[in-house]
Amino acid sequence: MRRTFAGIAIAAFVVALTAPAFAASETVKGQVVDMGCYKADKSNTGVDHKMPKGDTKDCALGCAKAGQPLALLTSDGKVYQISGSLAAEKNAKLIAHVSHTVEITGDVMNHDGKMMIMGENLKMVSK
């Protein structure tokens, strides 16, 4: 009886850990933003940002090139951190799209209210 219970408990634990692996593939449209600066000030959606010590020109590009997390900001205000192959090599595939509207296709996950998209494909919508 104990072995059966232990087996069921282990199986349930493994299923709980692998649940994010079953994320739904979606295409999400939004603006590519510097996640850290956007969280600090919701007006920081372009390339230049307002910072406590003054405006910072090309702030989002500098942060993206340094490998800081980028996010997709949708028209309804949802923020999806971009990960996966699009964010690899210090955002190499995303840098040219910072502040532009794009469509990203990939697995979407929600963990404790934090949205993430494992971006595999990107399509430019507008600059």
What are these regions (language model features)?
Residues 13-23:
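Sec/Tat signal peptide C-region and signal peptidase I cleavage site
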